[in-house]
Amino acid sequence: MAVLPDKEKLLRNFLRCANWEEKYLYIIELGQRMPELHDEDKSPQNSVQGCQSQVWIVMRQNAQGIIELQGDSDAAIVKGLIAVVFILYDQMTPQDIVNFDVRPWFEKMALTQHLTPSRSQGLEAMIRAIRAKAAALS
């Protein structure tokens, strides 16, 4: 995931934004940096339920046991939120993902306070889906 920053840089960049408009633009930019998801991966089995937008998340485990995530959405801000979540889970094993709590990171970024209720619910649905897939692999 070389095109996306690591967790610490994500937080630094987020905190450098002067206002919420800049933060939204940064989130959208992160989504634009994500690699394209192949059409065959945009299948019902990779679809995340509970999001107003269409969201697909693909999870694969590499030979070293590390989870590799790919995703997409038909909404720019949601695709950016997918990127944020993927950054937080980068280089983790399935068990690491199950044990990792993203909420402190969201609090540091003051992220959830500035999302609409439907986007917050969608974000939670993405996290639940990733954790469930990781639990099935661990």
Swiss-Prot record:
Function: Participates in cysteine desulfuration mediated by SufS. Cysteine desulfuration mobilizes sulfur from L-cysteine to yield L-alanine and constitutes an essential step in sulfur metabolism for biosynthesis of a variety of sulfur-containing biomolecules. Functions as a sulfur acceptor for SufS, by mediating the direct transfer of the sulfur atom from the S-sulfanylcysteine of SufS, an intermediate product of cysteine desulfuration process.
Entry-linked PANTHER family: CYSTEINE DESULFURATION PROTEIN SUFE (PTHR43597:SF3), SULFUR ACCEPTOR PROTEIN CSDE (PTHR43597)
Active site: 51 (cysteine persulfide intermediate)
Localization in the cell: Cytoplasm
Keywords from the named record: Cytoplasm
Keyword field contains RNA-binding: no
Protein name in UniProt: Cysteine desulfuration protein SufE
GO cellular-component term (any): cytoplasm
Gene Ontology biological process: iron-sulfur cluster assembly; sulfur compound metabolic process
Subunit structure: Homodimer. Interacts with SufS.
Source organism (scientific name): Escherichia fergusonii (strain ATCC 35469 / DSM 13698 / CCUG 18766 / IAM 14443 / JCM 21226 / LMG 7866 / NBRC 102419 / NCTC 12128 / CDC 0568-73)
Family in the record: Belongs to the SufE family.
Organism superkingdom: Bacteria
